[in-house]
Amino acid sequence: MSKFENVSVAKKANVYFDGACVSHSIEFPDGTAKSVGVILPATLTFGTTAPEVMELVEGHCRVTLPGADAPVTFRGGESFEVPADSEFTIEVLETVHYVCHYG
């Protein structure tokens, strides 16, 4: 799916890491929340409160997931899961366009 229908979008962007990651929160009619955004080339560590599925729409990165000894490479069209109350490190090699699915 290349677009979401019938959603509410927060006008103000979520800006993290001095602008290296910018996203917008969206809410579906059933209350489901997601964020859509971009991460510019950088190495960043994110914390989670809820479980997340990071869907890469486009881009190229290496991700070190909780408990992993080495990073795993992901490209557009792939996704990875992150447990609640954890951290992951992402090394963006080519700007990543993503959808973050919560819960």
Swiss-Prot record:
Protein name, as recorded: Pyrimidine/purine nucleoside phosphorylase
Enzyme class: transferase
Catalytic activity: a purine D-ribonucleoside + phosphate = a purine nucleobase + alpha-D-ribose 1-phosphate; adenosine + phosphate = alpha-D-ribose 1-phosphate + adenine; cytidine + phosphate = cytosine + alpha-D-ribose 1-phosphate; guanosine + phosphate = alpha-D-ribose 1-phosphate + guanine
Protein family membership: Belongs to the nucleoside phosphorylase PpnP family.
Enzyme Commission identifier(s): 2.4.2.1, 2.4.2.2
Pfam families given in the database record: Ppnp
UniProt key word Glycosyltransferase: yes
Annotated InterPro entries: Ppnp (IPR009664), RmlC-like_jellyroll (IPR014710), RmlC_Cupin_sf (IPR011051)
One Gene Ontology term of the molecular function aspect: uridine phosphorylase activity
Gene3D superfamilies per UniProt: Jelly Rolls
TM region(s), chain numbering: none
Disulfide bonds listed in the record: none
Keyword Transferase attributed: yes
Keywords (A to Z) from UniProt: Glycosyltransferase, Transferase
Protein purpose: Catalyzes the phosphorolysis of diverse nucleosides, yielding D-ribose 1-phosphate and the respective free bases. Can use uridine, adenosine, guanosine, cytidine, thymidine, inosine and xanthosine as substrates. Also catalyzes the reverse reactions.
GO CC annotations on file: cytosol
Gene from which this protein is expressed: ppnP
PANTHER family xrefs: PYRIMIDINE/PURINE NUCLEOSIDE PHOSPHORYLASE, PYRIMIDINE_PURINE NUCLEOSIDE PHOSPHORYLASE
